[in-house]
Amino acid sequence: MAVPPGHGPFSGFPGPQEHTQVLPDVRLLPRRLPLAFRDATSAPLRKLSVDLIKTYKHINEVYYAKKKRRAQQAPPQDSSNKKEKKVLNHGYDDDNHDYIVRSGERWLERYEIDSLIGKGSFGQVVKAYDHQTQELVAIKIIKNKKAFLNQAQIELRLLELMNQHDTEMKYYIVHLKRHFMFRNHLCLVFELLSYNLYDLLRNTHFRGVSLNLTRKLAQQLCTALLFLATPELSIIHCDLKPENILLCNPKRSAIKIVDFGSSCQLGQRIYQYIQSRFYRSPEVLLGTPYDLAIDMWSLGCILVEMHTGEPLFSGSNEVDQMNRIVEVLGIPPAAMLDQAPKARKYFERLPGGGWTLRRTKELRKDYQGPGTRRLQEVLGVQTGGPGGRRAGEPGHSPADYLRFQDLVLRMLEYEPAARISPLGALQHGFFRRTADEATNTGPAGSSASTSPAPLDTCPSSSTASSISSSGGSSGSSSDNRTYRYSNRYCGGPGPPITDCEMNSPQVPPSQPLRPWAGGDVPHKTHQAPASASSLPGTGAQLPPQPRYLGRPPSPTSPPPPELMDVSLVGGPADCSPPHPAPAPQHPAASALRTRMTGGRPPLPPPDDPATLGPHLGLRGVPQSTAASS
């Protein structure tokens, strides 16, 4: 019986016709399979993990080999076809719109440029020799950009306003001598000053200066803030920090505040992001309205840093900054946080209505909680100063530290209205002369010097110096302490030094301390000076101003602070030698830092319009110019 095709016992095997179709597929199978499996060392997973460095090296070798071959194969370029570099301001400016400084260049047939001593976001600062007055000066050259010019015009207006109310230069504000336009750059001529307070700290290897020198610095800074708070001025500095406080002389404790590039007047606030982070006040961090009290907060931070050698609040960002403040001072008042637009950036509201610190990824692992890092421990009130380094030293008793701690805490009040005012600070017990201090410094009427040996006998230091006369940047400047100015001194020994170390206002203990009035308009019931005539030196019983014997500076970096003459004798802060310095053959021949009298800016020569820009009459610049910046 015939079996139908496909139904036999071997029906699962292909028939003759199907076999011929399958055979080609079987023959192609070996071609599709690799002859050998890939080496494990060349697997992508290994190349991107264990052998990642080798992979990168191989990529670099291949890349640069191809680049070299392309360079060899490319035809030589004709120099005439090269793209010409863009020329700015007829070749006088660089790509950043800064003036290209050339040593030896003479401006207005008067200023001979010596060297560049500083650079910042505003522009540059150069040291120059004024042939008309035979003095060294510092010239701040503003960038050739409209926004920077507008902001510099505001700074210029404030500086001229302060100079009008401080004709004797005794309120520790940098003196603007004159201004002019040169090749489309606004140039501000300042007195040439010495090192800043950060350089002074650096010279102590960040161990801090004595409490006595801290007191002298605090007294001058409070006087300067009192001057700025007069109703005729009402100026907020907005960037008070050690880098913006300069010594007049490297051997004296006289200081001056510089860099009013971020400053404003009450009621005319321009920016919200102001102050360097370490010295930024809580109201600025929280986004609430601010007034002159923000400078008092910065001053409190500065005083602690000057004595301990380290910033009190050294936050890495704004959140960390607030955390460090809370760590010392506790949670801010609920009434303040309720009105703060940025309160929830740092804090969380509790169900009961209070506030607690916001737990974020930015919170430090070593954070100890609100109020756990006490200021008493930071200052070493009961342990002989910071790290016990001042134990047994005269003027560093627990009573001295308690007065210092109380003053700082009053400066660091959260509420701006409760923060101590400059006048109240000058009346604080920290500046009063006690019986123990009189014993340490000798009789009040004694003329015998109790100061250390002349500074010329101290060993020289290899620390690099840093000088500033007016520069700096806005509150958004870097907190990495860029050293903007550098210079050296030359000179010789000078006359002996008279030390009147403990001169300070004598205020009866019963007189109460008045808090800061707060707000944009001075409060009538608070002890705000009615005019400049009520400031120190014009009738009010406030700290006398420093007067200094002429003494040329040291050829080295800042002296050890303990060898500085910290005397403050009645009279204006004088940074000049006893006699006018003769004109050197070249500005580099002498780096003696002096003070000269002011004057009106000279008009540019009319026969040189190509070289000089038009004279700019910037007196009385309206505040509206700030809008474009």
Curated annotation (Swiss-Prot):
<feature type="compositionally biased region" description="Low complexity">
    <location>
        <begin position="586"/>
        <end position="600"/>
    </location>
</feature>
<feature type="compositionally biased region" description="Low complexity">
    <location>
        <begin position="438"/>
        <end position="478"/>
    </location>
</feature>
<comment type="subunit">
    <text>Dimer. Interacts with DCOHM, MAP2K3/MKK3, RANBP9 and TCF1/HNF1A. Part of a complex consisting of RANBP9, RAN, DYRK1B and COPS5. Interacts with DCAF7. Interacts with RNF169.</text>
</comment>
<feature type="modified residue" description="Phosphotyrosine">
    <location>
        <position position="129"/>
    </location>
</feature>
<feature type="modified residue" description="Phosphotyrosine; by autocatalysis">
    <location>
        <position position="271"/>
    </location>
</feature>
<dbReference type="GO" id="GO:0004713">
    <property type="term" value="F:protein tyrosine kinase activity"/>
</dbReference>
<dbReference type="GO" id="GO:0106310">
    <property type="term" value="F:protein serine kinase activity"/>
</dbReference>
<dbReference type="GO" id="GO:0003713">
    <property type="term" value="F:transcription coactivator activity"/>
</dbReference>
<dbReference type="InterPro" id="IPR050494">
    <property type="entry name" value="Ser_Thr_dual-spec_kinase"/>
</dbReference>
<feature type="binding site">
    <location>
        <begin position="117"/>
        <end position="125"/>
    </location>
    <ligand>
        <name>ATP</name>
    </ligand>
</feature>
<keyword id="KW-0067">ATP-binding</keyword>
<keyword id="KW-0808">Transferase</keyword>
<dbReference type="GO" id="GO:0006468">
    <property type="term" value="P:protein phosphorylation"/>
</dbReference>
<feature type="compositionally biased region" description="Pro residues">
    <location>
        <begin position="552"/>
        <end position="562"/>
    </location>
</feature>
<keyword id="KW-0539">Nucleus</keyword>
<dbReference type="InterPro" id="IPR011009">
    <property type="entry name" value="Kinase-like_dom_sf"/>
</dbReference>
<feature type="binding site">
    <location>
        <position position="140"/>
    </location>
    <ligand>
        <name>ATP</name>
    </ligand>
</feature>
<dbReference type="Pfam" id="PF00069">
    <property type="entry name" value="Pkinase"/>
</dbReference>
<keyword id="KW-0227">DNA damage</keyword>
<dbReference type="GO" id="GO:0005524">
    <property type="term" value="F:ATP binding"/>
</dbReference>
<feature type="modified residue" description="Phosphoserine">
    <location>
        <position position="624"/>
    </location>
</feature>
<dbReference type="GO" id="GO:0007520">
    <property type="term" value="P:myoblast fusion"/>
</dbReference>
<feature type="domain" description="Protein kinase">
    <location>
        <begin position="111"/>
        <end position="431"/>
    </location>
</feature>
<keyword id="KW-0219">Diabetes mellitus</keyword>
<dbReference type="InterPro" id="IPR008271">
    <property type="entry name" value="Ser/Thr_kinase_AS"/>
</dbReference>
<feature type="region of interest" description="Disordered">
    <location>
        <begin position="67"/>
        <end position="89"/>
    </location>
</feature>
<dbReference type="InterPro" id="IPR017441">
    <property type="entry name" value="Protein_kinase_ATP_BS"/>
</dbReference>
<feature type="region of interest" description="Disordered">
    <location>
        <begin position="436"/>
        <end position="629"/>
    </location>
</feature>
<keyword id="KW-0597">Phosphoprotein</keyword>
<feature type="modified residue" description="Phosphotyrosine">
    <location>
        <position position="92"/>
    </location>
</feature>
<feature type="compositionally biased region" description="Pro residues">
    <location>
        <begin position="575"/>
        <end position="585"/>
    </location>
</feature>
<protein>
    <recommendedName>
        <fullName>Dual specificity tyrosine-phosphorylation-regulated kinase 1B</fullName>
        <ecNumber>2.7.12.1</ecNumber>
    </recommendedName>
</protein>
<dbReference type="GO" id="GO:0005694">
    <property type="term" value="C:chromosome"/>
</dbReference>
<feature type="modified residue" description="Phosphoserine">
    <location>
        <position position="262"/>
    </location>
</feature>
<comment type="function">
    <text>Dual-specificity kinase which possesses both serine/threonine and tyrosine kinase activities. Plays an essential role in ribosomal DNA (rDNA) double-strand break repair and rDNA copy number maintenance. During DNA damage, mediates transcription silencing in part via phosphorylating and enforcing DSB accumulation of the histone methyltransferase EHMT2. Enhances the transcriptional activity of TCF1/HNF1A and FOXO1. Inhibits epithelial cell migration. Mediates colon carcinoma cell survival in mitogen-poor environments. Inhibits the SHH and WNT1 pathways, thereby enhancing adipogenesis.</text>
</comment>
<dbReference type="GO" id="GO:0004674">
    <property type="term" value="F:protein serine/threonine kinase activity"/>
</dbReference>
<keyword id="KW-0547">Nucleotide-binding</keyword>
<dbReference type="GO" id="GO:0045893">
    <property type="term" value="P:positive regulation of DNA-templated transcription"/>
</dbReference>
<feature type="modified residue" description="Phosphotyrosine">
    <location>
        <position position="401"/>
    </location>
</feature>
<feature type="modified residue" description="Phosphotyrosine">
    <location>
        <position position="111"/>
    </location>
</feature>
<feature type="short sequence motif" description="Bipartite nuclear localization signal">
    <location>
        <begin position="69"/>
        <end position="86"/>
    </location>
</feature>
<dbReference type="GO" id="GO:0060612">
    <property type="term" value="P:adipose tissue development"/>
</dbReference>
